[in-house]
């Protein structure tokens, strides 16, 4: 065996990235699900975001494993920055993400890598999922959206929020991640969705329509909402408006960004009127041609101009009216 072929045989096919901050009771099964993969050519990069001593002690025991590397970080609370720190250490041809409270099924990596290598035009992949509870049992939760699989060109589906891609479901070419710049560390929340949008601008996506990941629901599970959620979507759509070259899709992005701007300004107006005014002004340059935009601006402007006391009274009146009507 030549030196170059020996080096190639030692090179991992997949770099698995797990960011973690405490949650030791869920971290253990997450790591065990990586160790149980039927595909053996992987490396595991665990980026620790300043966890407590108990979690750090457990991670220290893993450093003796030949394919595991722990990256010790000061706490930032920024998932994108933590994942990027691990991404800079990755050496695999592909990168797979796993959250510290979720798990993989044993065949996940093997099936995804085989499918990606058989279809060179698709440089990233995702899978179906099941919901699990704190104990790892499969559960069905009220309000869960039905699984609607999409493959191929999915940018418009992503923009319209018609496709659900969980972070632990994704495997992506490392070169493609480098091409789009990794995670945006300035995203308030939903930095994964922002990355999917940028990946979809450069490549079609493959799908393994099987539930190969378990997404855990528990009390510590974070769900962004309100202003942070809208601010994140606004930032992503603004980037998409600059990146998308197809004229029809660009109009779609423009309309979505205009509506998101109005929604964000309206919500900001409840507590931060100056921020709401700045948000409205930021949307004018891209949205001034849309008739619906000006109707929305008028509505939000009236809301901002109304004294807070009257506005609160108006809102209470609307709620009371609705309750009487029903």
Q: Residue spans of the language-model regions?
A:
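A conserved hydrophobic helix/loop-capping motif in glycosyltransferases and polysaccharide synthases
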Residues: 14-26, 30, 37-38, 47
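A conserved acidic beta->alpha catalytic loop
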Residues: 33, 40, 48-58, 75-76, ...
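Glycine-rich, basic loop-to-helix element that forms the pyrophosphate-binding segment
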Residues: 73-90, 111
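Short aromatic/hydrophobic "clamp" motif used to bind/position activated sugar donors
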Residues: 95
């Amino acid at each position: 065996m030549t030196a170059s072929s020996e080096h190639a045989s030692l090179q991992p096919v997949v770099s698995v990235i797990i960011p973690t901050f405490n949650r030791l009771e869920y971290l253990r099964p997450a790591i065990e699900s990586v160790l149980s993969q039927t595909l053996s050519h992987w490396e595991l990069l665990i980026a620790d975001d300043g966890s407590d001593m108990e979690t750090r002690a457990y991670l220290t025991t893993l450093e003796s494993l030949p394919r595991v590397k722990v990256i010790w970080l000061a706490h930032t609370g920024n998932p994108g920055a933590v994942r990027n720190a691990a991404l800079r250490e990755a050496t695999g041809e592909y990168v797979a993400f796993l959250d510290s409270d979720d798990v993989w099924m044993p065949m996940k990596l093997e099936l995804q890598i085989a499918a990606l290598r058989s279809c060179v035009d698709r440089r990233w992949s995702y899978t179906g999922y099941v919901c699990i509870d704190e104990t790892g049992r499969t559960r069905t939760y009220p309000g869960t959206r039905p699984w609607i699989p999409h493959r191929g060109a999915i940018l418009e589906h992503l923009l319209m929020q018609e496709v659900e891609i969980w972070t632990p479901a994704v495997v992506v070419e490392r070169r493609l991640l480098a091409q789009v710049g990794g995670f945006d560390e300035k995203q308030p929340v939903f930095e994964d969705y922002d990355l999917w949008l940028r990946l979809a601008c450069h490549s079609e996506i493959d799908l393994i329509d099987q539930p190969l990941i378990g997404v855990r629901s528990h009390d510590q599970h974070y769900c962004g909402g309100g202003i942070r959620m809208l601010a994140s979507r606004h930032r992503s759509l603004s980037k998409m408006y600059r990146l998308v070259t197809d004229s029809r899709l660009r109009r779609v992005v423009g309309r979505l960004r205009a509506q998101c701007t109005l929604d964000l300004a309206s919500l900001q107006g409840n507590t931060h009127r100056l921020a709401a005014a700045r948000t409205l002004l930021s949307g004018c340059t891209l949205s001034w041609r849309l008739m619906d935009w000006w109707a929305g601006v008028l509505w939000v402007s009236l809301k901002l101009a109304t004294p807070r006391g009257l506005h609160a009274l108006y809102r209470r009146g609307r709620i009371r009216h609705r309750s009487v009507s029903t």
